[in-house]
Amino acid sequence: MTVPTTIRLPSKQTVILEGDDLRLRIDDNAPLPVLRPDEVLVRTMAVAINPCDYKMHERFPSPGAVDGCDFSGVILAIGAGVPSLGVSFQIGDRVCGAVHGSNPIRHDSGSFAEYIASEAEFTLKIPDSMSFEEAAALGGTGLATLGMALFRTLELPGTPEEPAQKPLTVLVHGGSSSVGTMAMQLLRLVGHIPITTCSPRNFALAKEYGAEEIFDYHEPDCGQKIKAYTRNTLRYVLDPFTDAKSIALCCGAMGRAGGRYACLEMYPDYLVEKRTLRVGFVMGPALLGHRLELDYGYERAADPEMRQFGIRWYRSIQWLLSKGQLKPHPLRVLPGRFDAILQGIEMLKSKSVSGEKLVVSIGM
């Protein structure tokens, strides 16, 4: 491990972890993460809050596990094996990314902490024009999830470096969400045409992030309107919610020939019984290629091929960032460091956030 001699690391840090009562709490005496050879140690400057930050620890309780996924910060130390990985980092680099929070296999891997160990091949350099808060809001979790959803589950052609020659229409359900705005940007950048659904108050936001056409998902005939707009030919759907309402809407919009359906939540059995649909459930941490020791269909075996895809995808994302072609969701920065993180999680649980990404500054 390379650590500059001018930096003295503390022995303890403040984190948010799962307590013995299975509730999230602040711990001011947690150890720093153990840095592995292929990782960089990051001093956290900002974190973003996602629904998975409460869903993971509620679904898969593991007392002692640090919560949180998306982060930005500054590199303080570099693992001994990083130079051989084909990535170039230096002490002091501004970076962002995502880690597997509430990980039952590795309790110290969450981002709601003052120090984070991040795999170098899945860490992104922040452009000079981007703040730490904006970088955290880019959503490393969302970027990982969308890479798998768009190119592995939907099997869309094209890459950021070589966009598709023949554009395809893709329905992004919930286009005013943070995953929706990023999905629409990425679809445009790889040569495709996003259409979306959201509340009318967020139509302008969805249009700003690339929507070709927008439909009000409150309308009972929304699916039929999408089907009419696409002339009964829609073949690609991204459904971040995968609940009864979203499935009914998206299936109602799908063309008569069927197609591919990417779910960001576990789907019900009846969805795969539709013979014209090829359905896939995507989990962001799976992009790392590690074994996911979870339950209820969320578990994954180690997948070296997926890891190689993920490394290539992150290089494409870094290329887009270097060209200034990705922008984060509109921010709402909460003051209060770790107390604010707990507040933000409750705000997401109560569904009181719309059209904004919750971000908390951690750096002093």
UniProtKB/Swiss-Prot annotation:
Record note on quaternary structure: Monomer.
Q: Could you tell me the keywords of this UniProt record?
A: NADP, Nucleotide-binding, Oxidoreductase
Q: Known InterPro entries for this protein? A: ADH-like_C, ADH-like_N, GroES-like_sf, NAD(P)-bd_dom_sf, PKS_ER, Trans-enoyl_RdTase-like
UniProt binding sites for NADP(+): 52-55, 176-179, 199-202, 217, 264-265, 353-354
Give the UniProt family note: Belongs to the zinc-containing alcohol dehydrogenase family.
Please describe what this protein does.
Trans-enoyl reductase; part of the gene cluster that mediates the biosynthesis of a family of the mycotoxins cytochalasins E and K. The hybrid PKS-NRPS synthetase ccsA and the enoyl reductase ccsC are responsible for fusion of phenylalanine with an octaketide backbone and subsequent release of the stable tetramic acid precursor. The polyketide synthase module (PKS) of the PKS-NRPS ccsA is responsible for the synthesis of the octaketide backbone. The downstream nonribosomal peptide synthetase (NRPS) amidates the carboxyl end of the octaketide with a phenylalanine.
Can you name the source organism? Aspergillus clavatus (strain ATCC 1007 / CBS 513.65 / DSM 816 / NCTC 3887 / NRRL 1 / QM 1276 / 107)
Q: Which Pfam families match?
A: ADH_N, ADH_zinc_N
Q: Which SMART domains match?
A: PKS_ER
Quote the protein name from its UniProt record.
Trans-enoyl reductase ccsC
Q: Which terms does the record give in the GO molecular function aspect?
A: nucleotide binding; oxidoreductase activity, acting on NAD(P)H
Q: Which PANTHER family match?
A: HYPOTHETICAL OXIDOREDUCTASE (EUROFUNG) (PTHR45348), TRANS-ENOYL REDUCTASE STHE (PTHR45348:SF1)
Q: In which pathway does it act?
A: Mycotoxin biosynthesis
| EC number, UniProt record | 1.-.-.-
